[in-house]
Amino acid sequence: MNIVETILTPILLNISQTDKWQRDFLIELFKTLFSRQGRFNFENLTRYSKYNELTHRRQFSKYLDWLSLNKSFVDFNSGVHIGVIDCSFISKSGKKTFGLDKFWSGVASQAKYGLEISVLACINVTTGKVTFLDATQTPSGLSKKEGSKYSRTDFYLEQILDCLKSLPTIVYYVADGFYAKEKIINGLTSNGKHLITKLRSDANLKYLNEKPRLKGQRGASRKYSGKVDFKKNGISDLSKWILVGLDEKYPHLTIYTQKLYAVNFDRIFGVVLLLNTKTNKYVLLASTDTKLDARLITKYYQLRFQIEFIFRDAKQFMGLNDCQARDENKLDYHFNASLTAVNIARKAIQQDEIYNKSMNNFMRYQYNRKFAETIYYKLSQNDEFDLIQSIWLQAPMWGNLVT
C-alpha cells in the first residue's frame, strides 16, 4: 500500500460527511499531486490520475471539512500548542476569478492585484512543529479600514471564531502587527482566548501608577504615572522596565517587560521590549494575558514564523499558485488541498527515513515510483518480462539528494 493511503485511510474514515467515493478521490488526488510533474491544475492532474477532468471539477465543488482532516495530524496531548494566523498572496491574472483585488505581497513589499488566503495553523511549543489547519480566501471589495461595517479585519476574525470550537485546547493565538486590532482582540478575549502580537514602535502606552494611596488623600487615585517616551534612536528611559535577561535563542536581544495601558485599545497589555544591542533598535510585543511570562511571549512570537515554511513548501512543491479555476468553491478546495498536502508529506517524511527528511526527495520518490509502476504494468503483459526485485526497490530512489 502506498504511504499516502496508509496515512489518509484511517483519518478519512473518522471524518463525518464523507462517503466512500469522496474518500477514494482524495487518496487518488494526493497520490497524483505528489507524483505529478508540472502544475497542479485540472488538465495536468488528468495526465497522471485515473480520474478525468470533469470528475476533478465536480469533486472540487463539494464541501469538505478541512479543519477536521488536518486536526488529525496534531497530537494535542503531546504538549502546549499555540494558534498562528497569517495571510499569503496568490498571483492570479484575469478578471472573472472570485476574490480578485489588491492585496499586500510580502515578496514584492507592495500591494498587488491577485488573490489572498487567510491561513490558520498550530505549532507545538516544545518541538516547534507547525501544522496547517484551515485556509479561507479573502473576498474582494472589503474595506481596509477597521471602522467600516464589514472590513477585512471582520473577515479574519470570523475565520478564527469559526474554528475556536474545534480547537478548545489552544488558548494563545499569535499574529503579526496587522492583527493588532481592537475587534480581533475583543473577539478572542471574549471567548476566553488570548492574542500575542506586535505593536507599533511608537505605540501610545502609559505606565500604571503603582504608588500606594496616601492617608487622607481626597479624590480618586491616579491610574497612570506618565506616557512611555519613545525616541528615534530607541526608548529614552528603561528604568521603569523590568529586566528579564538575554534571549536564549538570540543572545544579542535583551528582554524587558512591563504591564502598560494601551490607549488605542483601552486595555492593559503585558508588553515585552526586545532591545537589539547591536543596532540599539527595539521591537514591542504585547499579550492580552498580563500574567504570561515575558520569555514565553517572546518564544511564542518567534515560533510564529514557522508558518512561512508551510507557504514555502505549498508554493514550491504543492502548486498553491497553480489553480486554473475561477469559482469560489473550487478555489477554496484547491488552496486547502495544496496546504493539506504539506501536512501529509511531512507526516510521511517523519515516518520513513528513506526520504532523508527532504521534501524534494519525497516528491522525487513518489514520481519515480509512479513512473516505474507504469512501465512495469505495461511490460508485465508480456510473459517474457520478469521483475527483478532489487532493481524495483532501487528505482524510486533515482536522483535523491543525500544529506
Language-model regions: role of each:
Residues 79-84, 377-403:
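Long, charge-rich low-complexity segments
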Residues 141-270, 356-360, 401:
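An internal, acidic/charged active-site-proximal segment
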Residues 10, 14-95, 222-227, 360-380:
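Electropositive nucleic-acid engagement tracts
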Residues 322-376:
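Basic, amphipathic alpha-helical segments enriched in Lys/Arg and hydrophobic/aromatic residues
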Residues 45, 79-93, 120, 173-180, ...:
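Short, conserved catalytic/metal-binding motifs centered on acidic residues
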Residues 44-47, 106-170, 263-284, 291:
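Electropositive, glycine- and tryptophan-enriched low-complexity nucleic-acid-binding patches
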Residues 55, 60-129, 133, 244-247, ...:
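Active-site-proximal, Lys/Arg-enriched surface segment
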Residues 89, 228, 294-325:
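Short amphipathic alpha-helical "interface-anchor" segments enriched in bulky aromatics
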